Amino acid sequence: AMPSVAQDTPLSMVLSPDSEWEKIASGMKFCDACCTDGEGNFYFADTGNNGPIRKVSHDGSVKEYGPSLYGVSGLQFGKDSRLYICQAKARRISVLKNGDSLETVIENVRPNDLVVTKNNQLYFIETSTQRVYHVNLNDKIKVLRIVDTGILKPNGIGLTPCDGTLFVSDHLDKEVWFFRIEKNHRLTMKAPYASLRIRAKNLPSRGDGCDVDSLNRYYVTSDLGIQMFDPTGRLGGIILSPDPLKPV
């Protein structure tokens, strides 16, 4: 068996060259905010219809999950299977417990995307203000804290499995920004660690949703498709969009 070494990994070691996109759901207006739970079930929002979140199980079945929601732009499971939800148009972050009980966590913000650490620390991006925020979910009274400013149009946020590194994609710029998460939950060591490939000079990267696998390979959706980077920030390859004229 091939050893589990991620550094300098070409895409062909992760995805077979003859792999093709498979349709798992249809009839949506605009899909956003995908995430998975601890069992590997896949969730996404049909933001264009403002309906319930959709859950895709291992057998490929697609079911509605929870109540109808307005303007969902980010999803992430936290502790105790709680699903945290960015609702930018509704100006709040909500939490869905057990798939039915919905509560507001933070109001009067315009969250685009979020992550939650294993010790209940929530980070989210607010694209319009170019900010990254932190909220300690363990506190009874939730306090907003600005932990970064200045990324041109922050659009996606990700977290490494060890909760030590946070990274943010930029819709306009090609740089993906990386931070170290300190013990006091602040962000330090900000650096443009990886660069997205763009369609042509001076065009936006359309960097969006981010994720990372167990070997710290980074995945960022973009204008060209899903771009994969190894732990050093080197591009391993691009999974092209199923529609070459549209971003992922």
PLM region descriptions:
Residues 26-39, 68-87, 91-92, 107-123, ...:
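Beta-rich, blade/repeat-based domains predominating
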Residues 20-26, 60-66, 100-106, 142-148, ...:
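A short beta-strand motif characteristic of beta-propeller blades
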Residues 50-54, 91-94, 130-133, 174-177, ...:
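Structural signal for beta-propeller blades
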Residues 137-138, 179-186, 233:
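Short loop/turn segments immediately following beta-strands, especially the blade-tip
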Residues 42-63:
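Beta-propeller domains
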Residues 47-48, 88, 127-128, 171, ...:
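Short loop/turn segments immediately following the C-termini of beta-strands
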Residues 222-248:
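C-terminal closing repeat unit and adjoining cap/tail of repeat-based domains
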Residues 4-20, 135, 187:
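Blade/loop signatures of beta-propeller domains
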